[in-house]
Amino acid sequence: MIILGIDEAGRGPLSGPVVAAGVILDPEKTIDGLADSKKLTEKKRQSLYEVITAHAKAYTIVEVSPQQIDQLNILQATLKAMNQVADNLKGQFDKVLVDGNKLPNWDYNSEAIVKGDSKVQEISAASILAKVHRDNICLEHDRLFPQYGFAKHKGYPTKEHLENIRKYGVLNIHRKSYKPIQLLL
């Protein structure tokens, strides 16, 4: 059975997109070191990202913008991204395994697995792709808006990030539907 593993990154931050990734691994090849992306160092994630993208049978990465998150809400934006991931790889898998406890409303043979990023290698691989991709977006945001410190906090609601928003203002990459941002508008 060919498995498509899906995971997301970036539901909690105040800025940037939510990112979903899907990975189909070659069952003949194992990738050592796969784990939940949150349990890996940044260097290890980057190294595994290169290995996964080079050796996966197929993968895709989907972003949903802060503006779409504001229109839909974060749950619906995440489900939309996951749905797009599956549609992008349609016909290449038998079953979809998704990290978490919610599935998009779709017709795919699928299962939601709580802590799937620690249990299923395809989900672990998707977790790594989503996290590295989103972190790279945050590094680009840091280059564009260095005074906000995106390289450090990756958009999460840290004390520093909130202080910088107060000091420099809300950007178009901030999620305006999120309460901490609404309070600063």
UniProtKB/Swiss-Prot annotation:
It catalyses: Endonucleolytic cleavage to 5'-phosphomonoester. A divalent metal cation binds at D7, E8, D99. Manganese or magnesium. Binds 1 divalent metal ion per monomer in the absence of substrate. May bind a second metal ion after substrate binding. The keyword Nuclease applies. It is found in: Cytoplasm. GO terms for biological process: DNA replication, removal of RNA primer; mismatch repair. Residues 1-185 form the RNase H type-2 domain. GO terms for molecular function: manganese ion binding; RNA binding; RNA-DNA hybrid ribonuclease activity. This is Ribonuclease HII. It comes from Francisella philomiragia subsp. philomiragia (strain ATCC 25017 / CCUG 19701 / FSC 153 / O#319-036). InterPro entries: RNase_HII (IPR022898), RNase_HII/HIII (IPR001352), RNase_HII/HIII_dom (IPR024567), RNaseH-like_sf (IPR012337), RNaseH_sf (IPR036397). Belongs to the RNase HII family. GO terms for cellular component: cytoplasm; ribonuclease H2 complex. It comes from the Bacteria. Keywords: Cytoplasm, Endonuclease, Hydrolase, Manganese, Metal-binding, Nuclease. Its cofactor is Mn(2+); Mg(2+). Its EC number is 3.1.26.4. Endonuclease that specifically degrades the RNA of RNA-DNA hybrids. It is an enzyme of class 3 (hydrolase).
